[in-house]
Curated annotation (Swiss-Prot):
Protein name (record): Indole-3-glycerol phosphate synthase
Position of the signal peptide: none
Gene Ontology MF terms in the entry: indole-3-glycerol-phosphate synthase activity; phosphoribosylanthranilate isomerase activity
UniProt-listed GO biological process terms: L-tryptophan biosynthetic process
Enzyme Commission numbers on file: 4.1.1.48
Keyword Phosphoprotein: no
Keyword annotations from UniProtKB, A to Z: Amino-acid biosynthesis, Aromatic amino acid biosynthesis, Decarboxylase, Lyase, Tryptophan biosynthesis
Family statement drawn from the similarity comment of this UniProt entry: Belongs to the TrpC family.
């Protein structure tokens, strides 16, 4: 028997978690909570506005820990981080809510969203319609669908539930086969994860290799591995203007200032922030 990958372990735990949560709060009650949640803020629209202007559309991540790196930020203050990201020029937020592997929490999403006016994606491993409704009840504006974690039927089902609740969908891929499956969804948002979710190794070539296969009517977000100004410029030269970045910001003393330094160096210099030497 082969050893389960990190992703397989996460999905196995997520199945248990959904069962536990649905016993505590039934779907009907959750639907009622979703119906009275704050209106959605337009996640896809915020990215499209920046990308159409060829400006960096940064999805800035609020993340305490990861399976590969352990605790990344401590103390961890989601509201303070979110406000800093907005001041630094982020287009959207990504907030980890997975508890067991990323030390996330639903409350972190609520705290971050309340501290700013940016649209927020619930960054979690979505495998069941219950979680989609839960995302809207928490106030999320978008959900993540990871192709590697879903079969086609479930992926389309979750996308339909998201649409019914006014949520945007970011579909995430890592290779050509996953991209082919992802493009069957209606969503314009295609995230290319430079991190292999089975091995957690990172290569920016993943985005560059898959980019020619993405239709022009889709918006590509490059995810993971953007660590310095050279990485940003490499993507922009290849007409990729949307980025999901977490660790590079989370390790900085002031995440919002680091965002500005990486993506808006002219603005950062005018405020006395030292530019990235790379």
């Amino acid at each position: 028997m082969s050893v389960p990958t990190v992703l397989e372990k996460i999905i196995a735990r997520k199945l248990e978690e959904v069962a536990e949560r649905s016993r505590r709060i039934g779907l009907a009650e959750l639907e009622q909570q979703a119906a009275i949640a704050d209106p959605v803020r337009g996640f896809a629209a915020a990215l499209e506005q920046r990308v159409n202007a060829k400006e960096p559309a940064v999805i800035a991540e609020v993340k305490k820990a990861s399976p590969s790196k352990g605790v990344i930020r401590d103390p961890f203050l989601p509201a303070e981080i979110a406000a800093g990201y907005e001041a630094g020029g982020a287009a959207c937020l990504s907030v980890l809510t997975d508890i067991d592997f990323f030390q996330g929490a639903d409350a972190y999403l609520q705290q971050a969203r309340a501290a700013c006016s940016l649209p927020v994606i619930r960054k979690d491993f979505m495998i069941d319609p219950y979680q989609v409704v839960e995302a809207r009840a928490l106030g999320a504006d978008c959900i993540l669908l990871i192709v590697a974690a879903l079969d086609d039927a479930r992926m389309h089902e979750l996308a339909a539930v998201a649409k019914a609740h006014g949520l945007d969908v970011l579909v995430e891929v890592h290779d050509g086969d996953e991209l082919e499956r992802a493009l069957r969804l209606e969503t314009p948002l295609v995230g290319i994860n430079n991190r292999n979710l089975h091995t957690f190794e990172v290569s920016l070539e993943t985005t560059l290799d898959l980019l020619p296969r993405v239709p022009k009517d889709r918006l590509v977000i490059t995810e993971s591995g953007i660590l310095n100004r050279a990485d940003v410029e490499l993507m922009e030269i290849n007409q990729v203007y949307a980025f999901l970045v977490g660790e590079a910001f989370m390790r900085a003393e002031q995440p919002g200032v680091e965002l500005q330094r990486l993506f808006f160096p002219d603005r950062a210099r005018s405020r006395g922030v030292v530019a990235d030497p790379e």
